[in-house]
């Protein structure tokens, strides 16, 4: 099947190719998402070719007859590059490039390229470069243009005729660079570990925002910051684009009742997220593993939101975070003809983060989960134990207080550990 798009701009022109083996729940949606990825990589999609097969061709991924059709159609629509909706093996890339005589990309390379464009911090850049080089290493033959996609390198994926010495030199350079990157990442990861340890020692719960890319996680964090922090400098990049956020950002949220929490914004997930990226970003994604609560942000206006939730579930399982308690934020509900927002239930909330509708209720829902073990109790604290009273003032929610001759009566909502620690002052 063919589809052709007419475009005006003169950017890199991409022809998309996919094979429907029946394994995907919604193959058309997968191809649509591939187009979005290409556009996110600043390409123009000029055409689409799909093929139904029981299984992919080991040599060419598509059928041998389809290869000639792809070559012909690529020339017709003046494509500069061909993108396949799956990870291709090194031999498949080599065979396709030999047969079609055009640069060949797969979905994994495309996602890696987007990550490279979006990476801002030193850690993100190191992680992305590591993932790209590790993916490139076994695909060197016939892929020299891929070297141009590594910082500062040049070449052409379609270049041919390079000898074995050149390939071996390239391989050694890449292996050496990967070794250097891993050493640099170890230093950065140690810093992250120190910061995480400091947060854990504070006993303040950690809440991680997770979910599909572009679901609104950064918008939720920014609205929380605006309402409870009030410092615009603490906001993160918020754009309607795939993978706008690659860095893990942590913000301290204090709603004024001595029930603070750390809110963590994380990189978004996507269907067929490359395993190499998950591995390269493990130190960043580890923040999810250490969370006391996960807040899955869902684009409720997307018809495929259930499939996106399943992708999120599978990715969390792969990260070892599948058993962490979770609440569900059905974001962009204002686009779904829901008149009464926010709508709060036991483990979920329907809201519109971009309008700030439901932020207060979400904060309350979060606190009800992470402080579920808190207890209401009354202490009688002697005046000479002022440090105990000060501790309660700073670390518990004060429900009532009054001063009598024998000391300070404090009725508080506090952590059970604090109740046990100061049980000698409990008022019977």
Region locations from a protein language model:
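Conserved C-terminal guanine-recognition region of P-loop GTPase G domains, centered on the G4
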Residues: 33-39, 71-74, 88-101, 257-259, ...
């Amino acid at each position: 099947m063919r589809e052709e798009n007419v475009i005006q701009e003169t950017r890199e022109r991409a022809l998309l190719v996919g094979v429907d083996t029946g394994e995907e729940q919604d193959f058309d949606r997968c191809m649509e998402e591939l187009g979005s990825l290409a556009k996110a990589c600043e390409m123009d999609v000029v055409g689409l070719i799909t093929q139904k097969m029981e299984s992919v061709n080991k040599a060419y991924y598509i059928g041998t007859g389809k290869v000639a059709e792809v070559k012909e159609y690529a020339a017709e629509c003046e494509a500069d590059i061909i993108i396949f909706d799956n990870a291709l093996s090194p031999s498949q890339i080599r065979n396709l490039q030999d047969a079609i005589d055009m640069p060949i990309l797969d979905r994994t390379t495309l996602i890696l390229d987007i990550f490279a464009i979006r990476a801002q911090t030193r850690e993100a850049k190191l992680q992305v470069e590591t993932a790209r080089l590790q993916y490139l290493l076994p695909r060197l033959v016939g892929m020299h243009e891929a070297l141009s996609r590594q910082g500062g390198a040049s070449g052409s994926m379609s270049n041919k005729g390079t000898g074995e010495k050149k390939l071996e030199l390239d391989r050694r350079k890449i292996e050496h660079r990967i070794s250097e990157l891993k050493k640099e990442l170890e230093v950065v990861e140690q810093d992250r570990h120190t910061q995480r340890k400091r947060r854990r020692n504070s006993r303040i719960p950690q809440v991680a925002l997770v979910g599909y890319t572009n679901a609104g996680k950064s918008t939720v964090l920014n609205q929380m910051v605006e309402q409870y922090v009030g410092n615009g400098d603490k906001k993160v990049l918020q754009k309607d684009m795939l993978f706008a956020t690659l860095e893990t950002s942590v913000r301290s949220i204090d709603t004024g009742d001595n029930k603070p929490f750390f809110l963590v914004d994380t990189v978004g997930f996507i269907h067929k997220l490359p395993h190499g990226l998950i591995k390269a970003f493990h130190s960043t994604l580890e923040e999810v593993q250490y969370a006391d609560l996960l807040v899955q942000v869902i684009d409720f206006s997307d018809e495929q939101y259930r499939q996106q939730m399943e992708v999120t579930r599978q990715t969390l399982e792969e990260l070892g975070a599948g058993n962490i308690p979770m609440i569900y934020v059905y974001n962009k509900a204002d686009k779904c003809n829901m008149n009464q927002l926010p709508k709060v239930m036991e483990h979920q909330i329907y809201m519109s983060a971009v309008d700030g509708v439901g932020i207060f209720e979400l904060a309350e829902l979060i606190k009800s989960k992470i402080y579920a073990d808190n207890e209401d109790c009354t202490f009688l604290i002697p005046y000479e134990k002022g440090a105990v009273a000060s501790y309660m003032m700073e670390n518990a929610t004060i429900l009532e207080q009054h001063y009598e001759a024998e000391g300070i009566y404090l009725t508080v909502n506090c952590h059970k550990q604090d109740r046990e620690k100061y049980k000698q002052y409990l008022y019977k």
